[in-house]
Amino acid sequence: MTEAKPTRRNAIAMLGAGASATATLGSSPALAQATARPFVLVHGSWHGGWCWRRVADLLDAKGHKVYTPTLTGLGERSHLMSGMITLDTHITDVANVIKWENLQDVVLVGHSYAGFVISGVAERVQPAISSIVFLDAFLPQNGECVLDLTPPDLHAATLAAVAKNEVGRPVPPAKAFNVNEKDQAWVDSKLTPQPTFASLTPIVLTGAREKIAKKTYIRATSYPNPRFDGYLEKLKQDPAWRTYGVPSGHDVMVDMPDRLSEILLEVA
């Protein structure tokens, strides 16, 4: 049998096919999307979705879809502040993002107060969540409310607000969270009062949080908080949890967005 000699046209076609195959393997949108994950990042008291911008940009650059909902009555939704806002309102805010966006395989992250929020969200949409992350956050048990777990100064401030029927708890300075000096003015300009009665709502938990496959606790070690230290030490002994300590103030997403993004990708 005589072997056919390659023609110039065949050579060009072969080169084109090879380049196309390389492009498909190296930069296929379908391939990139196969590993993309939805991240839902939930802020804590006095904050808003704005505080996640640096982390969201880093995760987005890696091809992930990122949602940073602002809870009712805070941030750009501060005009909705009222005495009717409870913890359940905030749980609904986040659960509805997951429901209405039809999200699955969610990495759900809650900062500080939002440890209550994401624990409640797990009760409503647990099958949609594959990884839950508590970022320097409360880890509540059934029947607890935020007021039960707050440090003495914040406990007193909340009771004073309730006594005066104030719908919003006063804003502390960013310095109180040990935010780095460069970002303190920016954070101060964004903080808004925290809905008072959200701190009084007991949470109802039936164990949905514990059914989530991946569970992580991240402690900001430069922010003194004995309760959070206790969570970390307890969870270090639990093989169902991954734990991290980062040398940051309370607002890790502001102070150390690069390191936080790395951890979130590790535990996704």
PLM regions: where:
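Conserved alpha/beta-hydrolase
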Residues: 60-78
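Conserved loop-alpha-helix segment in the C-terminal half of the alpha/beta-hydrolase fold
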Residues: 221-247, 254
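Active-site loop/oxyanion-hole signature of alpha/beta-hydrolase fold enzymes
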Residues: 73-106, 123-124, 148-150
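Flexible "cap/lid" loop of the alpha/beta hydrolase fold
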Residues: 133-165, 227
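C-terminal segment of N-terminal export signals and the immediately downstream linker at the start
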Residues: 25-44
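N-terminal export signals
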Residues: 2-5, 10-31
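Catalytic active-site module of serine/aspartate enzymes centered on a nucleophile-bearing elbow/loop
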Residues: 244-268
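Conserved hydrolase catalytic core segment
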Residues: 107-141
